[in-house]
């Protein structure tokens, strides 16, 4: 994809393990034309990692979906919906957390605590992965460099977060 292309993509977190691509698309189609819906699966087990992405045809549909779906129930779970960072932005995925991926609050985080992880220490699955994993988590602070995807993603990184985030970044010490 050329760097000038614009995608209207939402990050959807907190998904039930049973939610599939089709259920995700169906839930979001009421807001506009869905171009793509994708649940991210663990490459070793094939199971859902509890998050995914929905891409819309236009910006209005994306913004309406974020407004309408964030905090709503889908398949028995309250989901989080945010605008996804494009793959081309954020300086190529540099990870500024240093060391083990940006835990700053000592005991593994909690929602604020100076750049800790959104989901706490181990994510929502055994052995890391899931919504936050071991690699920093969602950080609303500029220097956090957090990782939505969690620590088990090859090469560290993960989705977005902080300055210099970037989807699928391979820089720095992110992850386990």
UniProtKB/Swiss-Prot annotation:
Q: Report whether Phosphoprotein shows up as a keyword of the record.
A: yes
What Pfam families has UniProt attached to this entry? RRM_1
Q: Provide any one GO MF term from the record.
A: single-stranded RNA binding
Q: Which UniProt keywords apply?
A: Acetylation, ADP-ribosylation, Chaperone, Cytoplasm, Immunity, Innate immunity, mRNA processing, mRNA splicing, Nucleus, Phosphoprotein, Plant defense, RNA-binding, Secreted
Q: Where in the cell is it found?
A: Cytoplasm; Nucleus; Secreted
List every position bearing ADP-ribosylarginine: 49
Q: How does it assemble?
A: Interacts with TRN1. Interacts with the Pseudomonas syringae type III effector HopU1. Binds to small phloem-mobile single-stranded RNAs (ss-sRNA, e.g. small interfering RNA (siRNA) and microRNA (miRNA)) in the phloeme exudate, including viral-derived sRNA (vsiRNA).
Task: Reproduce the miscellaneous comment text.
Answer: Plants overexpressing RBG7 display retarded germination and affected seedling growth under salt and dehydration stress conditions, confer freezing tolerance and also possess enhanced resistance to P.syringae.
Q: What is this protein called?
A: Glycine-rich RNA-binding protein 7
Species annotation: Arabidopsis thaliana
